[in-house]
Regions:
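Non-catalytic regulatory/interaction regions at protein termini and inter-domain linkers
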Residues: 1-6, 10, 18, 34, ...
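Alpha-helical transmembrane segments and their helix-membrane boundary motifs
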Residues: 4-17, 244-256
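Juxtamembrane extracytoplasmic/periplasmic/luminal helical "stalk" adjacent to the first N-terminal
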Residues: 9-12, 16-80
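Amphipathic alpha-helical regulatory segments at dimerization interfaces
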Residues: 53, 67, 87-97, 130-131, ...
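Short N-terminal helix-loop-first-beta-strand/juxtamembrane motif that initiates sensory/input modules
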Residues: 63-64, 91-111, 183-202
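Extracytoplasmic/periplasmic ligand-binding sensor regions of membrane-associated signaling proteins
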Residues: 97-171
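Sensory-domain boundary capping and coupling elements
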Residues: 169-172, 233-235
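Extracellular/periplasmic juxtamembrane segments that couple receptor/chemosensory ectodomains to their
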Residues: 198-258
């Protein structure tokens, strides 16, 4: 009889032990997931803030270009077609655009065609041709990536009295203002990478800031509005040691503790 009671007590003890262990492990999982969810939420907010800064900068630059392109003097320069006059106007416009490294006024000969005398590189020429054939604004693009002449281009139409494109105002900007906008949103220990979609469905990194975080950190992707760019952000926040690592180890530790 005494042995039977002892066996029952031992079985009850084991059941209680397993219940406590299961409850402890469930609590661990809940805390771990809650912490990861918190990190992911903060990372998403940070990436969105950086994307918003990029969008704000691009919007301001495009609006300045559209305002300048709407001036009668700009249309007159394009219509007269005097190279020296056009170069002076380009220099004047460049001085009005913070961060601009070059400005071109490009007359339009016909649908999708540009004068052969224009000394544009192949990427910029392709960009302008797509601008000339589009009914909506074309997203800015980085060109000469990795070279000393690296820049991103924004182009707007210069319209005549009938609101038809007479040419295009092309502005090339240094990456510095864009990089500064990203740096303002980058927290300590974080890593941000701005990537541009290429023609072959590949992505190319155009700006990388911070240090690549270790595995296990929150990583999110955000897309600035009206762009071909994607922003990738790694927060650098790592779960505390007690909430990371081998879960079997913690399960065994709980059993021993109980």
């Amino acid at each position: 009889m005494a042995q039977s009671l002892t066996r029952v007590h031992f079985q009850v003890f084991l059941i209680l032990l397993l219940c406590f262990a299961a409850a402890g492990y469930a609590g661990y999982l809940a805390m771990h997931d809650l912490q990861l969810s918190s990190y992911q939420h903060r990372a998403s907010q940070t990436a969105r803030a950086a994307s918003d800064r990029i969008t704000e900068l691009l919007t301001q630059q495009r609006q300045r270009l559209e305002k300048i392109a709407g001036q009668p003097g700009v249309l007159g320069v394009l219509q007269r077609g005097v190279p020296a006059e056009r170069e002076r106007k380009e220099d004047e416009i460049k001085s009005m655009l913070p961060g601009a490294v070059a400005v071109r006024l490009l007359p339009r000969n016909g649908p999708g065609t540009m004068p052969s005398t224009e000394t544009l590189d192949r990427a910029c020429l392709d960009f302008i041709r797509r601008v000339s054939m589009a009914n909506t604004p074309v997203a800015p693009e980085f060109h000469a990536i990795g070279a000393a002449t690296e820049h991103y281009d924004i182009a707007v139409a210069v319209r005549d009295e009938n609101r038809k494109p007479a040419g295009y105002l092309l502005a090339s900007f240094a990456r510095a203002p864009l990089q500064s906008a990203i740096e303002l949103a980058l927290p300590p220990g974080g890593y941000m990478e701005l990537q541009q979609a290429m023609a072959d469905d590949q992505w190319q990194t155009v700006i990388a800031l911070g240090q690549v975080a270790s595995a296990g950190t929150a990583s999110v992707v955000s897309t600035p509005s009206d762009s071909r760019w994607t922003l990738m952000f790694q927060s650098g926040e790592v779960p505390s040691a007690i909430l990371s690592g081998n879960r079997i180890f913690y399960f065994a530790f709980i059993l021993l503790a109980l």
